[in-house]
């Protein structure tokens, strides 16, 4: 089954002035954004399923899978009905950073956009100038009978980093994800890339650490020259911690474990041993020069 451009145009025309624009509720039937409207229009025209309504970042590869060819990259071209434009450089076009739509003739485009709160027909160059003349790509259908290659699932890697493709073709983005094959939680940033060897302060107010392989830290973890303790859900612990039969103290601000030192907590002083354990009934001696020594 190939892509029929006229069916795609008809899908958009049928919804012109009848749907609203929304990046939060982009899967219809009452609202779409620029990329989801293009996705569903081309799906109605015979394009293959990606498992989700691809955004402008992932639309490039999806178009090529469905028989489109990149015919212009930020260079003049003679537009034809059915050409699809994508504004915004790859890697920086997701969300409000990009835009896409379809040409219905050499000058005009049909697109779902914020300015008209829905699907409208406009002069391409006017809208492009109004948007600040963004970097652009143009794709044209050259093989209407293209059969998309088998989708790659699981862990994927490119020059930027790792991401994870789910069985339904979607990918985690700006969220935690439990990967069964790794038996661990991971976190993926707003571009879908795995965090590695990084701290994350989440919107829940907690701090999390992900090691060089992206695994979320739990229990004790040495990071740099300090030790930290993380709950089973990965959140960093501060204050007193009872671990088996011993007590430890992690800084209330930074979370690093204190050791070989006195700490003041509430109205008392506590002695922590070199390995961080709270000393059990230490004996103190005040030397003639005022130095306090401890016997543990």
Curated annotation (Swiss-Prot):
Its EC number is 3.5.1.28. It catalyses: Hydrolyzes the link between N-acetylmuramoyl residues and L-amino acid residues in certain cell-wall glycopeptides. Cell wall-binding repeats lie at residues 152-171, 173-194, 196-216, 217-236, 237-256, 259-278. Keywords: Antimicrobial, Bacteriolytic enzyme, Cell wall biogenesis/degradation, Hydrolase, Pharmaceutical, Protease, Repeat, Thiol protease. The active site is at residues 34, 99, 111. It is found in: Host cell wall. It comes from the Viruses. Gene3D superfamilies: Cholin Binding, endopeptidase domain like (from Nostoc punctiforme), Multimodular pneumococcal cell wall endolysin, domain 3. Its main location: host cell. One of its GO terms (molecular function) is cysteine-type peptidase activity. GO terms for cellular component: host cell wall. Residues 1-142 form the NlpC/P60 domain. InterPro entries: Cell_wall/Cho-bd_repeat, NLP_P60_dom, Papain-like_cys_pep_sf, Phage_lysin. The keyword Nucleotide-binding does not apply. Lysis of bacterial host cell wall. Belongs to the peptidase C40 family. This is Lysin. It comes from Pneumococcus phage Dp-1 (Bacteriophage Dp-1). The gene is PAL.
């Amino acid at each position: 089954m190939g892509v029929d451009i006229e069916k795609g145009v008809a899908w958009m025309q049928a919804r012109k002035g009848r749907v609203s624009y929304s990046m939060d509720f982009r899967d219809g039937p009452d609202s779409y954004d620029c990329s989801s409207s293009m996705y569903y229009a081309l799906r109605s025209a015979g394009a293959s399923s990606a498992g989700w309504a691809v955004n402008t970042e992932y639309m490039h590869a999806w178009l090529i899978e469905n028989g489109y060819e990149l015919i212009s990259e930020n260079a003049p071209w003679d537009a034809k009905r059915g050409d699809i434009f994508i504004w915004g450089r790859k890697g920086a076009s997701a969300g409000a950073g990009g835009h896409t739509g379809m040409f219905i003739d050499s000058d005009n485009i049909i697109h779902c956009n914020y300015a008209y709160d829905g699907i409208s027909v406009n002069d391409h160059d006017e809208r492009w100038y109004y948007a600040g003349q963004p970097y652009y790509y143009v794709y044209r259908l050259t093989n209407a009978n293209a059969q998309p290659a088998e989708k790659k699932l699981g862990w994927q890697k490119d020059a930027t980093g790792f991401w994870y493709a789910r069985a339904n073709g979607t990918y985690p983005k700006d969220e935690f994800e439990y990967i069964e094959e790794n038996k661990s939680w991971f976190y993926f940033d707003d571009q879908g890339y795995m965090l590695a060897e990084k701290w994350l302060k989440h919107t829940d107010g907690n701090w999390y650490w992900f090691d060089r392989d992206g695994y979320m830290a739990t229990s004790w973890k040495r990071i740099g020259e300090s030790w930290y303790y993380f709950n089973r859900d990965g959140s960093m612990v501060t204050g007193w911690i009872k671990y088996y039969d011993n007590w430890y103290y992690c800084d209330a601000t930074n979370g690093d474990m204190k050791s070989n030192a006195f700490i003041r907590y509430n109205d008392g002083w506590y002695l922590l041993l070199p390995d961080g354990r709270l000393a059990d009934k230490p004996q103190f001696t005040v030397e003639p020069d005022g130095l306090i020594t401890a016997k543990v």
